[in-house]
Amino acid sequence: MSRRVLLINGPNLNLLGKREPHIYGSTTLEDIETQARQQAHELGVEIDTFQSNHEGAIVDRIQETAGWGPNVRETDTPGKRVSAIIINAGALTHTSVAVRDALAAVAIPFVELHVSNVHARETFRAHSYLSDKAVAVICGMGAYGYSAAIEFAAKHLKIEGE
């Protein structure tokens, strides 16, 4: 399997750069994805990006990483399979057992990511359904958190792959 990472962004992250810039900054998701592709290329890693405001679509995409899911046929090539997942699940972090279960089912190492420091915000944001299953959690680093997650994933994959 090639060193491929899937970057998932959940609900409202398509509004980065517009929504509450005093919390989330002015960098857009498009900017983040462009930077992610460039950085991944420099690190010798392929990266796929996916954003959805819909929980089921995110669950489907996670399942596809293992060759499963409603949109995968037995004749499909494993083109959507990955070695690691970086996920900013947005509000689904605090509510979605379905996303947690999908990540646990595929058993692919994942990094949980948040642009803001969720522990310095409303109390409900401090609880994550994902953290105890993640190999790493990054929060409060703004858009730079994506770069840190990609670097970590690339190094983790290199260690695992050698």
Curated annotation (Swiss-Prot):
Catalytic class of the enzyme: lyase
Pathway field: Aromatic compound metabolism; 3,4-dihydroxybenzoate biosynthesis; 3,4-dihydroxybenzoate from 3-dehydroquinate: step 1/2
Amino acids binding substrate: N88, H94, D101, V115, S116, R125
Keywords on record: Lyase, Quinate metabolism
Leader sequence residues: none
GO annotation terms (biological process): 3,4-dihydroxybenzoate biosynthetic process; quinate catabolic process
Molecular-function annotations in GO: 3-dehydroquinate dehydratase activity
Active-site residues per Swiss-Prot or TrEMBL entry: Y24 (proton acceptor), H114 (proton donor)
EC number: 4.2.1.10
InterPro entries linked: DHquinase_II (IPR001874), DHquinase_II_CS (IPR018509), DHquinase_II_sf (IPR036441)
Catalytic activity, as annotated: 3-dehydroquinate = 3-dehydroshikimate + H2O
Site annotation Transition state stabilizer: residues: R19
CDD domains: DHQase_II
A UniProt-annotated Pfam family: DHquinase_II
Gene3D superfamilies membership: Dehydroquinase, class II (3.40.50.9100)
PROSITE patterns xref list: DEHYDROQUINASE_II
Family membership: Belongs to the type-II 3-dehydroquinase family.
Known partners and oligomeric status: Homododecamer. Adopts a ring-like structure, composed of an arrangement of two hexameric rings stacked on top of one another.
HAMAP family: AroQ
Task performed by this protein: Is involved in the catabolism of quinate. Allows the utilization of quinate as carbon source via the beta-ketoadipate pathway.
Name of protein: Catabolic 3-dehydroquinase
Organism this protein belongs to: Podospora anserina (strain S / ATCC MYA-4624 / DSM 980 / FGSC 10383) (Pleurage anserina)
Gene this protein is translated from: qutE
